[in-house]
Amino acid sequence: MNFEGKLVGTDLKVAIVVSRFNDFITNRLLDGAKDTLVRHGVEDSNIDVAYVPGAFEIPLVSKKLAQKGEYDAVITLGCVIRGATSHYDYVCNEVAKGVSKANDVSDIPVIFGVLTTESIEQAVERAGTKAGNKGAEAAVSAIEMANLLKQF
């Protein structure tokens, strides 16, 4: 038997957790995610957005939203750009671990859509220019995974 999640968002309710830090990038990711959800049939009224100060705060809020029982998926969006210190490594590792843990404590998908880039140029490329929009890609993953998990 094969199981696959369809890319149909009708009747799905989705939460998006987005970081305000580097908002010139995260706003583009958010726009891409919301546009993709709506294009796949998710009603705009079924998309809730929670803003957090930075990427480090994403895991806690995504876990709380996932545990509420109101959503079919949670999408996380943020942008961490390497600087001159090791802060980048700590933030990236903890955000990835935290989002993974949020998946472990809920029955819905928590999708990792946080950019971890070496430069501002890489971030811009992944927020809607030549490398696509990773927010849109995260939305597609959320729809597919939400529909897949409904089969179990």
From Swiss-Prot:
An example GO CC term for this entry is: riboflavin synthase complex
Give the matching SUPFAM superfamilies.
Answer: Lumazine synthase
Q: Which residues bind 5-amino-6-(D-ribitylamino)uracil?
A: F21, A55, F56, E57, C79, V80, I81, F112
Establish whether keyword Repressor is in the entry.
Answer: no
Pathway annotation: Cofactor biosynthesis; riboflavin biosynthesis; riboflavin from 2-hydroxy-3-oxobutyl phosphate and 5-amino-6-(D-ribitylamino)uracil: step 1/2
Q: Where is the active site?
A: H87
What is any one GO biological process for this UniProt entry? riboflavin biosynthetic process
Entry annotated with the keyword Transferase: yes
Q: Which InterPro entries match?
A: LS, LS/RS, LS/RS_sf
Which positions in this protein are listed as binding (2S)-2-hydroxy-3-oxobutyl phosphate?
A84, T85, R126
List UniProt keywords, sorted A-Z.
Riboflavin biosynthesis, Transferase
Any GO molecular function: 6,7-dimethyl-8-ribityllumazine synthase activity
The EC number of this protein is: 2.5.1.78
Top-level division of the source organism's lineage: Bacteria
Q: Say what the protein does.
A: Catalyzes the formation of 6,7-dimethyl-8-ribityllumazine by condensation of 5-amino-6-(D-ribitylamino)uracil with 3,4-dihydroxy-2-butanone 4-phosphate. This is the penultimate step in the biosynthesis of riboflavin.
Please report which protein family the annotation says this sequence is part of. Answer: Belongs to the DMRL synthase family.
Its subunit composition reads: Forms an icosahedral capsid composed of 60 subunits, arranged as a dodecamer of pentamers.
Q: What is this protein called?
A: 6,7-dimethyl-8-ribityllumazine synthase
Species source reads Staphylococcus haemolyticus (strain JCSC1435)
From the UniProt record, report the name of the gene that encodes this protein: ribH
